[in-house]
Amino acid sequence: KVGILTRGYGTPSEHSIVVSADIDPDEYCDKLGDEPAVILRQVPEVIVVKGKDRIHAAQVAVNEHACEVLILDDGYQFLHLARNENILLIDSQNPFGNGKLIPRGFLREPLREIHRATHCVVTRVTDDLDRAEIINAVRSYAPDVQIEWTQHTPTRLLHPLTGVEQSLDIFSGQEVVAACAIGNPEAFTRTLEDLGMTVIETHAFPDHDTISTEVFKSKHPVIITEKDAVRIKHPPDNLFVLEVELETLETTTPG
């Protein structure tokens, strides 16, 4: 039985403990957060425990819900909870920023802390990516770590008002509007363009925010992410949701 521990960014009462098994599915997004809501849509049998106190959340998951495996969301830096595996994600499009820590740069920790990783997953890999920089950096601190190269692959385009699945190429060669409240809106726009769509506008909102209904007044199809879709209670007819999955392209083993 798997439990996921999350801070629940963008939700009220972040300090209190909220468990997915104790609330209605319609409340997942409001009480747990958008990302946990997406996970529970895809894997409804998992237990999500939201709370700022990660140790307390872990105790609730194990003692009250019999969880045998715990996944700590966004927990690489949280050193107060022992773990068996440490999965490090690296964004291939900006792997190490300017080498500086927040707020002078993008890094949360110095590069030397790569040594704590037991697995490394490189995301948003493109065909023209020069992998040498990433391999050399990882190997210099964690020589025995396996590196997985991945990309977000579109799987389907859903019309949420009717629940009808559309072909991924239905808007190929047509003008569309992109809207999202994610950390990297440029990547979402590129994905739509790779599917042949002509993106005439991109409305980017702060991460974990709700897309303004003003966007839906467009005469063009509006494409959003699955993460954004869980926040929209009454989808309009021109709204479509692009769903993606993480695909492993290749694995680089030590040696």
Per-region residue spans from a language model:
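Hydrophobic residues at beta-strand termini and immediately following loops
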Residues: 49, 90, 150, 203, ...
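Active-site regions of enzymes building and remodeling cell-envelope glycoconjugates
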Residues: 20-22, 45-46, 84-87, 196-200, ...
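Phosphate- and divalent-cation-binding pockets in alpha/beta enzyme and binding domains
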Residues: 56-60, 133, 187-191, 231-232
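C-terminal accessory "lid"/substrate-recognition subdomains
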Residues: 95-221
